[in-house]
Amino acid sequence: MRAFSALEFGAVFAVGGSLLAVAVPAFFRNLSASKLTEPIEGLDRMVTNAVAYAARHPQEISFPPSAPLTPAEVPRGVRALDPRDAWQHLTWLSLDFRFTQPHAFSFKFDSELDPATQVMRFTATAHGDLDGDGVLSTFEVRGERVPGQPARVLPGMFIDREVE
């Protein structure tokens, strides 16, 4: 077996480097996207159920009452399994929202009626600390129900420090 020439070695090195240049960024992009699945899908489930809830209730109680951050302590750099009663708040039950598997984000639901306009609004929030440094990421979706109209989710999602 003969040794590689400098030219052959350079060609192999260049091809290998090119493959890494393409594969590594794609890997990290997909890794980042997989970590964002939980808050995006969780909020989507929550707001979809909030809009369905509003369709069955009068204007002044279009959405269930506010629910605290659940779990109260945002998991720090790990996926945590919740205590059995963590999702027993009336709002989580009304929205059919809970986690039965370990997860990395905490969720909150706020609702309020504007007394001047009678517009009912909600904010669904997810907080996470994927790297465990104590700095939280925030994902937030808003919705409303204007008198005489069906409830709707407002366009867009607020995201702050998405991979924190």
Name each model-derived stretch.
Residues 1-31:
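N-terminal single-pass transmembrane signal-anchor helix
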Residues 40-45, 50-97:
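Short, glycine/small-hydrophobic-rich surface segments
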Residues 98-109:
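A short, amphipathic edge element
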Residues 111-117:
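Short, solvent-exposed beta-strand/turn "edge" segments of beta-rich domains on protein surfaces
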Residues 129-136:
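Acidic, glycine-anchored loop motifs typical of Ca2+
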Residues 136-164:
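Low-complexity, S/T/G/P-rich flexible repeat/linker segments used as non-globular hinges
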